[in-house]
Design a protein with these regions (language model features):
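N-terminal active-site beta-alpha-beta segment that forms phosphate/nucleotide-binding
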Residues: 6-132
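Conserved phosphate- and dinucleotide-binding cores of soluble alpha/beta proteins
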Residues: 4-7, 15, 97-213
Length: 213
């Protein structure tokens, strides 16, 4: 007869899921981590820990790194084992000016740069401007243009996608309840680099997205 052996391992399932993601979305690679998280913070911590070694393999001398913002990326940096690099810069991919400590505690650009002995650059603007006109004025400033140009040319972008309710921008009250309900009604399903996105990953046509940097 024929003996068939199958190992029912969660790790094997993760590999199969990763392969399926690569094929479906034409990716170069994907990693799926086992999680028993009971809340968003536990999930962020587990994803942060799992992504550390993957990202570490992508970092080398003479490169620029763009870094997003939020709970998951802060957990990634907090658990990341750094190493000295030469001619490396880390650029924030979102605005960095704020008066709220609740926002600052999720900023990780400074720490990642320190762990790599790298230059650190910030976008000199808030994440959410008070109006679209203010945003237009800020992005026309020479200093902003210079750093924004460098952010667009990074060799490696480290970012995360937040759920609609769990996105850090929502948790720290950078949008009002009224704005949140309104953008949800417009079809938003998540948040990427501050922008609310729909199920096709398009930026939702909503005034809040006109104020994001």
């Amino acid at each position: 007869g024929i003996v068939s052996i199958r190992i029912n391992s969660p790790l094997l399932e993760n590999i199969e899921l990763a392969d399926a993601l690569v094929k479906k979305y034409d990716l170069q690679a994907a990693e799926v981590c086992l999680s028993h998280a009971t809340d968003e913070y536990q999930l962020a911590r587990q994803i942060g820990a799992a992504s550390g070694e993957v990202i570490r393999r992508c970092i080398h001398d003479s490169m620029s790194i763009g870094l997003g913002w939020g709970i998951t990326l802060k957990e990634f940096v907090d658990q990341f084992v750094g190493f000295p690099c030469k001619d490396v810069s880390v650029v924030s991919l979102l605005g960095s000016l704020t008066r709220r400590s609740s926002v600052t505690r999720f900023e990780a650009t400074t720490e990642l740069a320190a762990r790599l002995d790298a230059e650190c650059l910030y976008l000199p603007a808030p994440i959410v401007c008070d109006s679209a006109d203010t945003r237009r004025l800020l992005i026309e400033q020479p200093l902003f243009k210079d750093i924004y140009s460098r952010a667009l040319q990074t060799d490696l972008a480290i970012v995360s996608i937040g759920g609609l309710d769990s996105a850090t921008i929502r948790l720290v009250d950078l949008v009002t309840d009224e704005e949140f309900d309104s953008v949800r009604a417009k079809g938003a399903i998540g948040n990427f680099l501050g922008y609310y996105i729909d199920e096709q990953a398009g930026i939702v046509d909503h005034p809040i997205n006109d104020r994001i940097i």
